[in-house]
Design a protein with these regions (language model features):
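A nucleotide-sugar donor-handling region in carbohydrate enzymes
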Residues: 1-11, 139-143, 170-174
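C-terminal alpha-helical cap of glycosyltransferases
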Residues: 154-175
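Catalytic binding pocket for nucleotide-activated donors in carbohydrate/polymer assembly enzymes
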Residues: 46-51, 80-150
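Donor nucleotide-activated moiety binding/catalytic core segment of transferases
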Residues: 34, 39-83
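Conserved catalytic-core segment of nucleotide-activated headgroup transferases in glycan assembly
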Residues: 1-47, 153, 157-159
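Residues at the C-termini of beta-strands that transition into short coil/loop
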Residues: 2-3, 37, 59, 96, ...
């Protein structure tokens, strides 16, 4: 879980216990929530849910990319980490209890209704989105969204850079 920063410093009311139960029922296996708060946002009401067993506070962990790599799903609101998760093609759910107000105040380049993610405004909607999640539909939405935005990610960035530099060096007579 990774909420974004808000000037209002409102508390995030995500029910971690219910989240873990929903993930177990839908996806099977054992689940642990890694909660990463925004570094400028101090959420107080969640502190009593962070038990170190099912919910671990990783707010001080610097590398969000590593957390995305080890995560099976992501729950966020408007944090840009959703787009990093999209590239992994792993499930991402939006928990945005203040979506109307946030949209009015801040706006979005691409409206949330066009995102490939299921959006929930409360814990019940989030549970419903998890329980009715279909990976085949999600993968198709990702593909269409990437096509719409012009995504060039194909997993070969290092090779493309290597080939580009090599070609430039060869053209200059450097081997």
């Amino acid at each position: 879980c990774a909420p974004t920063w808000r000037a209002e410093q409102e508390d995030y009311d995500l029910n971690f216990q219910q989240l873990v139960k929903s993930c177990k029922r839908k996806f099977g296996g054992e689940w642990v929530v890694l909660f990463r708060n925004h570094k400028y946002h101090k959420i107080n009401t969640l502190k009593n849910q962070i038990d170190g067993e099912y919910v671990i506070d990783v707010s001080e962990y610097d590398d969000m990319q590593e957390l995305i790599c080890i995560s099976n799903i992501l729950i966020t609101d408007y944090s840009s980490c959703m787009w990093d998760m999209l590239l992994t093609k792993k499930p991402c759910f939006i928990y945005a209890q203040d979506i109307e107000r946030y949209t009015r105040r801040n706006g979005f380049y691409v409206p949330p209704s066009a995102w490939p993610f299921l959006i929930a405004k409360n814990n019940e909607e989030l549970e419903n989105n998890i329980m009715h999640f279909r990976d085949d539909i999600y993968q198709e939405k990702i593909k269409m969204h990437c096509k719409y935005l012009g995504c060039f990610e194909n997993g070969n960035a290092n090779k493309a850079i290597y080939d580009f530099v090599k070609e430039k060096l060869i053209n200059k007579g450097i081997n």
